[in-house]
Curated annotation (Swiss-Prot):
The chain crosses the membrane at residues 6-26. It comes from Alkaliphilus oremlandii (strain OhILAs) (Clostridium oremlandii (strain OhILAs)). Keywords: Cell membrane, Endonuclease, Hydrolase, Membrane, Nuclease, RNA-binding, Transmembrane, Transmembrane helix. This is Ribonuclease Y. SMART domains: HDc (SM00471), KH (SM00322). It is a single-pass membrane protein. One of its GO terms (molecular function) is RNA binding. The keyword Hydrolase applies. It is found in: Cell membrane. Residues 331-424 form the HD domain. Its EC number is 3.1.-.-. PANTHER family: RIBONUCLEASE Y. Residues 205-290 form the KH domain. GO terms for cellular component: plasma membrane.
Amino acid sequence: MPNTLVLNGLLILVGILIGCLVGYFFRKNIAEGKISNAEDLAKKIVEDAEKDAETTKKELLLEAKEEVHKLRNELERENRERRNELQRTERRLIQKEEALDKKSETLELKDEKLNKKLKELDNKELEINNLYQKEVEKLEELSGLTSEEARELILSDVEKQTKYEVALMIKDIESKAKEESEKKAREVIAYSIQKCAADHVAETTVSVVQLPSDEMKGRIIGREGRNIRTLETLTGIDLIIDDTPEAVILSGFDPIRREVARIALEKLIVDGRIHPARIEEMVEKARKEVDNIIKEAGEQATFETGVHGLHPELVKLLGRLKYRTSYGQNVLNHSIEVSYLAGIMAAELGADVKLAKRAGLLHDIGKAVDHEIEGTHVEIGMELLKKYKESKDVIHAMSTHHGDYEPESIEAILVTAADAISAARPGARRETLESYIKRLEKLEEIANGHDGVEKSYAIQAGREIRIIVKPEVYNDEEIFMLARNITKKIEFELEYPGQIKVNVIRETRAIEYAK
């Protein structure tokens, strides 16, 4: 049994070996067949590739030859075009060169002609100079004047003629400007005055208190004059008791103190009890009453003019102007009138109405305290307005109304004009005889101070001065320059309300006697 198994195993092993050998040889034969086939296929592929490559090579060579041919043709065409363009450019250059040659020849001909003409002109100029010199010598010989003297004579004549023409032009321009400005000013001022009607009460330095009887005079004087002394001491006013029937005169330059004394005295007369203690009580009441009157007057002025927002102290100062006068004109009423006029004129001219009215109302505010503070009323007024925070425009507009400062705004000019209109209105002011006479004398003195003035007369209460000149000194045109110069001197040297008319008269008379 075991031997049989071994034998079977050996047989199986031998069978496997034989199978392996048979398989090896079989695969070898198959592989060799495949290799042979592959070699044949490879040869065929190579042959086909060589044929395709040859064909492609031939096609590429053909295409390259065609491209080269095409490029050659293109280059030849471009070369032909360039040659043609160069030929055309060459022809144009040749034509330009020929044209330049022709122009050059023409210019040379013209240059020759110009040179000839210049030579001819030089010769003619020399000839003219010679002729001119000969003529000058002949003229000098005939006239007896040198050329320099003749030139001065001609210049003098030209200067006179020019001055004459300038005077005519100035006369014409001034006449037209004056006519237009006066027409417009008259329209504005007339319209303004028509809309303004202010009352003016002329005040003096005395007040009169009526008495019920002359017996009251003794009671006012009191025992040994103690009553009158007390009243004068408390008020600072002089009481004049004379032979005037049933009247006592209060004299003093401070109108507010005079008003306090008047009210106190009237109250004492009504009360009947007149002694120092009662006098002191009544004076104190009168002061309070006057303070209230002042306050109400200031408030009424601001209400009437429509000026609002003033500092209370400025309102009080305005009220004090109720008791101030200037040349007999009540200053508060004058200020209200100036405010009205300035506002109306500002409205007509398109200026700032509120500014003009405010500055017009405050323009004389310094007069309320000018007897207490040193300085002009303009300077005092400026300081007061600065103190109470008024605007720079208002301060400037009020500061120019007496010419102390140059006006820089139309409102300032309008305030000045309104002040002059109010002051110059007939009956508004009066002045002392002495100052009036001095002003007239000064007017005539200014006029007589000019050469060629024969006589001068101040007329129309100093509103006009007539000047008679010597006709041999001034001609008809030069008198306008004289009038202008005199006007400027009057404006510079004199102070006067309103305006002064300067009338220059030139009269020529021819007198002969028949024998």
